[in-house]
């Protein structure tokens, strides 16, 4: 093994150096303080859990993303957490057992076996919130507002909010009574926005002419808020669940606008991200210059059923590393340089400055690196028996 081999990191595993690490930590504190002010309690899930609980109710996507290992004590299979949300759902259902709404937040690093197709990293630092125990639209509105407020705290300027609702597609497909094979083919075609394939599949497999028109129109219903008016016309004879979903999306759009949140709303009624996992509205927030969503979330009711308590739930997550890149942070230069000296009063002066929040770096005997290299812009200087802070010459 060469020296170069010893410092190589696995693909997608990264280290965070100054000043980016400082920026991440400042942002972590700011976001968790924000969530606390909204009433969200911090939880810290384990890094590794048994696969039985870690992958419950999440479908195959998370299974493929999970690093797996054998527990040397029990012989059971374990997995490194690739997504915090299922863990927090378990904590709500089994560990906390609160009867009313439970607001929980978290910030922890997860590991993924494969890199996200939009991001190279396999060890994102996931920060977010989950609201359990309330099935109403007010809970969805709250988490969307909190996600947008968090992006503002992170320094995001222009934000594009993409809204969708899993219930629309689910209700139409249920009414069409498609076979499992036909539904899978239709799902994949809609995900690709392959209009011609959708048209052909629906014309072949759906007998109701009204449902044919609705399913063929579904992937074409995307754009600004005017899409909702178009959808009400297209889905005039649709199952009641479709109109209920449109009403929810209308209310979400209104909530974003009425609260003067800086976000341009975009709708995609065929957004099927997390179809096996989400049960209602889904959203993603984008910022110009970034190809991937900075915040993703939605409603995922009944995830806790496998743990003995089916609870309505909604929430979102963000990658702290990605958020920290919104504002370029140069090396900080705000320290106070203290000499390597034993003169009276120096230690007390340093202690007072540090207690007041100042960054004080004391030279070590024989040190050749000066205050500029240590990113200091001031220095402690003795004058007439007193230590004073003065600008560096």
Swiss-Prot record:
GO terms for cellular component: cytoplasm. It is found in: Cytoplasm. Keywords: Amino-acid biosynthesis, Cytoplasm, Histidine biosynthesis. One of its GO terms (biological process) is L-histidine biosynthetic process. Pfam families: tRNA-synt_His. It comes from the Bacteria. Pathway: Amino-acid biosynthesis; L-histidine biosynthesis; L-histidine from 5-phospho-alpha-D-ribose 1-diphosphate: step 1/9. The keyword Amino-acid biosynthesis applies. This function is generally fulfilled by the C-terminal part of HisG, which is missing in some bacteria such as this one. HAMAP family: HisZ. Belongs to the class-II aminoacyl-tRNA synthetase family. HisZ subfamily. Heteromultimer composed of HisG and HisZ subunits. PANTHER family: HISTIDINE--TRNA LIGASE, HISTIDYL-TRNA SYNTHETASE. Required for the first step of histidine biosynthesis. May allow the feedback regulation of ATP phosphoribosyltransferase activity by histidine. This is ATP phosphoribosyltransferase regulatory subunit. It comes from Chromohalobacter salexigens (strain ATCC BAA-138 / DSM 3043 / CIP 106854 / NCIMB 13768 / 1H11).
């Amino acid at each position: 093994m060469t020296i170069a081999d010893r410092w190589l990191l696995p693909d997608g595993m990264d280290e965070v150096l100054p000043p980016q690490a400082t920026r991440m930590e400042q942002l972590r504190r700011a976001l968790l303080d924000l969530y606390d002010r909204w009433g969200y309690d911090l939880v810290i899930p384990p890094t590794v859990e048994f696969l039985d609980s870690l992958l419950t109710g999440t479908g195959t996507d998370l299974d493929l993303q999970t690093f797996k290992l054998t527990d040397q004590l029990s012989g059971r299979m374990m997995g490194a957490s690739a997504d915090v949300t299922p863990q927090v759902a378990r904590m709500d259902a089994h560990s906390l057992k609160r009867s009313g709404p439970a607001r929980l937040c978290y910030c922890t690093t997860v590991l993924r076996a494969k890199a996200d197709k939009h991001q190279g990293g396999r060890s994102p630092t996931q920060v977010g919130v989950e609201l359990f125990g309330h099935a109403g639209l007010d809970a969805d509105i709250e988490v969307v507002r909190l996600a947008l407020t968090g992006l503002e705290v992170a320094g995001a300027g222009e934000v594009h909010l993409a809204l969708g609702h899993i219930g629309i597609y689910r209700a139409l497909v249920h009414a069409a009574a498609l076979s499992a094979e036909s539904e899978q083919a239709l799902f994949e075609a809609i995900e690709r926005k392959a209009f011609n394939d959708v048209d052909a599949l629906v014309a072949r497999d759906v007998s109701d002419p009204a449902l044919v028109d609705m399913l063929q129109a579904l992937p074409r219903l995307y754009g600004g808020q005017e899409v909702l008016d178009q959808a009400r016309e297209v889905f005039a004879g649709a199952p009641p669940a479709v109109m209920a979903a449109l009403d929810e999306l209308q209310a979400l759009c209104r909530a974003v606008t009425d609260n003067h949140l800086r976000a341009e709303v975009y709708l995609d009624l065929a957004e099927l991200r997390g179809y096996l996992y989400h049960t209602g509205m889904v959203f993603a927030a984008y910022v110009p210059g970034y190809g991937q969503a900075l915040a993703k979330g939605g409603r995922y009711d009944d995830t806790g059923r496998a743990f003995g308590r089916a609870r309505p739930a909604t929430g979102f997550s963000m990658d702290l590393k990605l958020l920290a890149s919104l504002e370029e942070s140069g090396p900080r230069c705000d320290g106070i340089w203290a000499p390597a000296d034993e003169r009276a009063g120096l230690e007390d002066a340093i202690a007072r400055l540090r207690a007041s929040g100042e960054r004080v770096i004391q030279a070590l005997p024989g040190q050749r690196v000066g205050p500029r290299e240590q990113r200091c812009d001031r220095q402690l200087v003795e004058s007439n028996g007193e230590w004073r802070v003065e600008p560096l010459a």
